[in-house]
């Protein structure tokens, strides 16, 4: 076995060699330097010493604390000569504690004794003890001392009321003694001794001095009050037997109560030092307070500390408790009293947090956060009247599905857009600008299907004029009424285009009458809505329609600033496989140029490419011009306002700030499971998990909205994930984990996803028309619903005879009155029209042969399973359960 030096041993233990040498020497191992060798016996001896020191065995040890307090009392004798009386108080306290706490207690006791005895000249000096503690243990014990001091502070505050009552009692006793002791016999020799009684208040170190008028005349005889004030024997005996007056004076001084002779109060935190019994006097007999005894006393707070708490928009329970310097459990208690079950990590809104702060007695103020969006307020976006120029009107074409909105725009643009739409219906917002002889007009084509409500509302918000297309042969339909409501809510003028006027059944007057019922009054009837009869097939009335639109635009006096940072609205957005996030935007003011930094919601980016509606690259776009931009960090939310900034760093900062803010809002909206929800959960509810991927975000929103409307109390739709772009591997893995069906709307799976679909068998459905997707999901939900179960009566059997067979049991001879009886059908036994048994047949025979069924008018024999109480005259009803599939 190789020998090990002290330095190597210290390196193995992870400590300094000097510290290890000190511990070895304390353990009795003679080692002088780090180069000395350490044997196994030395290690064992060191280990035994450390175990005894730190108490690894866990045994309990007694600690005796001996404290001695020495004080001096200066008094004058009868002749007026000063004399000093030395008083020593010894206290002995035995503590039983764990071994690991004994070192700290002993150390504190030794330090306390050394500090107290250092003041006395005759006290022996404390021998310093070598400490073998490391820094971590010292820190732990310091933390224990800090906690102990905090506990003492709290207990002192709790005793505040008791000490106040004690002070009042002492004051009352003083007043009583003043009145009762001023009795003096004539002719007797008395000595007037100036006594005073004072009480020390716990909340301050000031003492209430007794006025000189409170002089108590004491007779030579011992009164009951004197006995109470002198519970102990006199410490100083009179030395002389002289005059009676001197003897009485010496006796009064000897019988005075001194703080060192009295038993200490049991209450922790009483720092009065017994001053309420006696006030010290100077050599002239005047009372004075001993300030030296109370100058280091603990002073409990007299009033609760009121904090000023700054409340942001959202704040967690833990952070709110930290701001008020209370425990989180106290905040949770207040919220529970308000009816909110929360956790320490749950987010609270600003109003709730302010109510909680005020309930707990603090001052709540709304915080002014470090909001990066304040930079946007500094950007001058206010329109300058001198720089404003006229702009082209933005016209939204709205109406019911298949009423010819896109066909009308086709004729205006001289293109064939409707022919390229799947199913002949529009499923996106199309933005185009058309140059006419009287100016430029920007058209927005919105979907007419009822699932695209959000798209139509978005189109109504960013438009100047609404063209309401109504089919002359179909009339006013639900989406037509909805379009009228959107336009009126946005206070937008309406131009009604009555389409399909080339059909013989077209009736313009009927359309006017129907729209008047919904608040759209034509001009010739005294209203403000222009009605134009058009035909997208023949071109009838198209010029008149454009003329009406431009006339309405002139009345509105549309203006905007051109030379300014661009500002507009995201019309539509999607994820292109080759180009990344793509957004269709409509510039409302300013000029948007290639290379500008765009900020919209929590998305930002630098414009790398900009295309018009024909797919041609453009370098800039003015007001009322729709363009398609590339370069955003992710797919933007449709309907969001965008703004062009000059500082990309500031745009990134604002976007990240909004992302964090949206995250707090999402956490706040997380559903917290309540007890009533747990007990009220219904296990028979079926849930269909779906993953929706679409080509553009608007279609994704519309499909999710349409599918959510199919929910009932029995079947629910859970959209696990929705997004734009192709179906990728992560979507398939998510569907596999959540057992969801993947719906691809105008998009397909990539190569990796197709391989994963083939290997896992995940159900993926592709659609390009929203009707088909909704119908398929409706069928799936109908199949998940529990079918309707109805009873169908098959026949009625009358029991004529009863036979009891020992090996078989009770057999009934029956006659089929109505219908038929089947061997496998459930039956009911009726006695006097009351059901006495429900069950099934055990056997069915006819002429000793087992049969499956017996029809009406024939006799048969039967026995029931687990039922023998059959009587003659009973009837048996035969029925079956018919399940009918339910349809949404």
Curated annotation (Swiss-Prot):
Provide the residue span(s) of the region labelled G5: 535-537
GO CC entries: cytosol
Indicate where this protein is primarily found.
cytoplasm
Start-end of Low complexity biased regions: 207-225
Region: Disordered; residue ranges are 96-122, 158-302
Residues of the region (G1) are 399-406
> Ranges of Polar residues compositional bias?
181-206
Question: Keywords on this record?
Answer: Cytoplasm, GTP-binding, Initiation factor, Nucleotide-binding, Protein biosynthesis
The tr-type G domain is annotated at 390-559
Q: Could you tell me where the Basic and acidic residues compositional bias lies?
A: 98-114, 158-167, 226-243, 253-269
Cross-referenced CDD domains: IF2_eIF5B, IF2_mtIF2_II, mtIF2_IVc
The subcellular location is: Cytoplasm
Where is the secretion signal located?
A: none
The UniProt entry, under InterPro entries, shows: DNA-bd_dom_put_sf (IPR009061), EF-G-like_DII (IPR053905), IF2_assoc_dom_bac (IPR013575), IF2_II (IPR044145), IF2_N (IPR006847), P-loop_NTPase (IPR027417), Small_GTP-bd (IPR005225), T_Tr_GTP-bd_dom (IPR000795)
| Residue numbers spanned by region G4 | 499-502
Give any GO molecular function from the UniProt entry. Answer: translation initiation factor activity
Q: Where is this region: G3?
A: 445-448
Q: Which residues bind GTP?
A: 399-406, 445-449, 499-502
Q: Where is this region: G2?
A: 424-428
Instruction: Give me the segments passing through the membrane.
Output: none
The UniProt entry, under HAMAP family, shows:
IF_2_B (MF_00100_B)
Per the record, the similarity remark reads:
Belongs to the TRAFAC class translation factor GTPase superfamily. Classic translation factor GTPase family. IF-2 subfamily.
- So what does this one do? One of the essential components for the initiation of protein synthesis. Protects formylmethionyl-tRNA from spontaneous hydrolysis and promotes its binding to the 30S ribosomal subunits. Also involved in the hydrolysis of GTP during the formation of the 70S ribosomal complex.
Protein's name in the database: Translation initiation factor IF-2
Q: Which organism is it from?
A: Nitrosomonas eutropha (strain DSM 101675 / C91 / Nm57)
């Amino acid at each position: 076995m190789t020998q090990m030096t002290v330095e190597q041993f210290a390196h193995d233990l992870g400590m300094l060699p000097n510290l290890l040498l000190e511990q070895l020497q304390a353990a009795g191992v003679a080692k002088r330097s780090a180069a000395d060798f350490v044997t196994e016996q030395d290690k064992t001896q060191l280990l035994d010493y450390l175990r005894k020191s730190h108490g690894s065995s866990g045994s309990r040890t007694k600690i005796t604390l001996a404290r001695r307090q020495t004080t001096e009392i200066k008094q004058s004798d009868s002749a007026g000569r000063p004399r000093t009386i030395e008083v020593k108080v010894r206290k002995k306290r035995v503590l039983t504690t764990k071994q690991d706490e004994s070192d700290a207690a002993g150390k504190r006791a030794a330090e306390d004794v050394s500090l107290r005895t250092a003041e006395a000249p005759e006290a022996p000096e404390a021998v310093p003890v070598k400490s073998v503690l490391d820094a971590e243990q010292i820190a732990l014990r310091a933390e224990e001392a800090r906690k102990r001091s905090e506990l003492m502070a709290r207990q002192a505050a709790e005793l505040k009321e008791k000490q106040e009552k004690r002070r009042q009692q002492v004051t009352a006793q003083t007043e009583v003694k003043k009145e009762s002791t001023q009795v003096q016999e004539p002719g007797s020799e008395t000595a007037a001794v100036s006594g005073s009684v004072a009480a020390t208040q716990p909340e301050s170190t000031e003492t209430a001095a007794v006025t000189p008028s409170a002089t108590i005349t004491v007779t030579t005889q011992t009164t009951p009050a004197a006995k109470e004030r002198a519970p102990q024997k006199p410490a100083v005996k009179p030395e002389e037997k002289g005059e009676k007056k001197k003897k009485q004076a010496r006796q009064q001084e000897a019988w005075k109560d001194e703080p060192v002779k009295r038993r200490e109060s049991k209450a922790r935190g009483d720092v009065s030092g017994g001053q309420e019994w006696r006030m010290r006097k100077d050599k002239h007999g005047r009372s004075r307070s001993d300030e030296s005894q109370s100058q280091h006393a603990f002073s409990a707070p007299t009033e609760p500390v009121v904090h000023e708490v700054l409340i942001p928009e959202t704040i967690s329970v833990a952070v709110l408790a930290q701001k008020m310097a209370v425990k989180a459990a106290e905040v949770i208690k207040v919220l529970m009293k308000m009816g909110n079950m929360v956790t320490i990590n749950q987010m609270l809104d600003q109003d709730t947090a302010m109510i909680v702060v005020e309930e707990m007695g603090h001052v709540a103020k709304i915080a002014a956060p470090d909001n990066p969006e304040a930079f946007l307020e500094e950007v001058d976006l206010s329109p300058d009247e001198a720089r404003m120029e006229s702009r082209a009107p933005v016209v939204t074409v709205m109406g019911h599905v298949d009423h010819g909105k896109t066909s009308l725009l086709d004729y205006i643009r001289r293109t064939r857009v409707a022919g390229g739409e799947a199913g002949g219906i529009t499923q996106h917002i199309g933005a185009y600008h058309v140059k006419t002889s009287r100016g430029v007009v920007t058209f927005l084509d919105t979907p007419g299907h009822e699932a695209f409500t959000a798209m139509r509302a978005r189109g109504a918000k960013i438009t100047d004029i609404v063209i309401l297309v109504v089919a002359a042969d179909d009339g006013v339909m639900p989406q037509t009424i909805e379009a009228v409501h959107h336009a009126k809510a946005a206070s937008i003028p309406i131009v009604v285009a009555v389409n399909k006027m080339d059909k013989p059944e077209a009736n313009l007057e009927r359309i006017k009458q129907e729209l008047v019922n919904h608040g759209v009054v034509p001009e010739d009837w005294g209203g403000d809505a222009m009605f134009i009869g058009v035909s997208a097939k023949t071109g009838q009335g198209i010029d008149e329609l454009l003329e009406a639109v431009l006339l309405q635009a002139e009345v509105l006096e549309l203006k905007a600033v051109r030379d300014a940072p661009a500002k507009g609205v995201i019309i539509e957005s999607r994820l292109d496989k080759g180009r990344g996030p793509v957004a269709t935007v409509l510039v409302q003011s300013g000029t948007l140029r290639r290379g500008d930094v765009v900020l919209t919601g929590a998305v930002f980016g630098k414009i790398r490419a900009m295309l018009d509606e024909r797919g041609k690259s453009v370098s800039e776009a003015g007001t009322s011009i729709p363009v398609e931009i590339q370069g955003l960090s992710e797919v933007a939310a449709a309907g969001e306002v965008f703004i062009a900034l000059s500082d990309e760093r500031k745009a990134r900062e604002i976007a990240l700030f909004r992302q964090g803010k949206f995250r707090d809002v999402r956490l706040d909206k997380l559903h917290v499971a309540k007890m009533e929800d747990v007990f009220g959960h219904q296990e028979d509810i079926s849930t269909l998990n779906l993953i929706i991927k679409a080509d553009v975000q608007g279609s994704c929103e519309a499909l999710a909205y349409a599918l959510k409307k199919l929910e009932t109390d029995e079947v629910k739709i859970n959209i696990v994930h929705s997004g734009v772009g192709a179906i990728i591997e992560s979507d398939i893995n998510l569907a596999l984990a959540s057992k969801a069906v993947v719906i691809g709307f105008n998009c397909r799976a990539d190569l990796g996803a197709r391989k994963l679909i083939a290997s896992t068998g995940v159900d993926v459905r592709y659609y390009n028309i929203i009707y088909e997707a909704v119908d398929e999901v409706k069928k799936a939900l109908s199949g998940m619903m529990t079918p309707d179960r109805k009873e169908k009566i098959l026949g009625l059997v009358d029991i004529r005879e009863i036979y009891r067979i020992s090996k078989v049991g009770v057999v009934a001879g029956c006659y089929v009155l109505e219908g038929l009886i089947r061997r496998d059908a459930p039956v009911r036994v009726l006695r006097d029209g009351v059901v006495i048994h429900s069950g099934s047949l055990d056997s069915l025979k006819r002429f000793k042969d087992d049969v499956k069924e017996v029809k009406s008018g024939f006799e048969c024999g039967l026995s029931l399973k687990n039922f023998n109480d059959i009587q003659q005259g009973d009837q048996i009803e035969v029925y079956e359960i018919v399940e009918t599939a339910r349809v949404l």
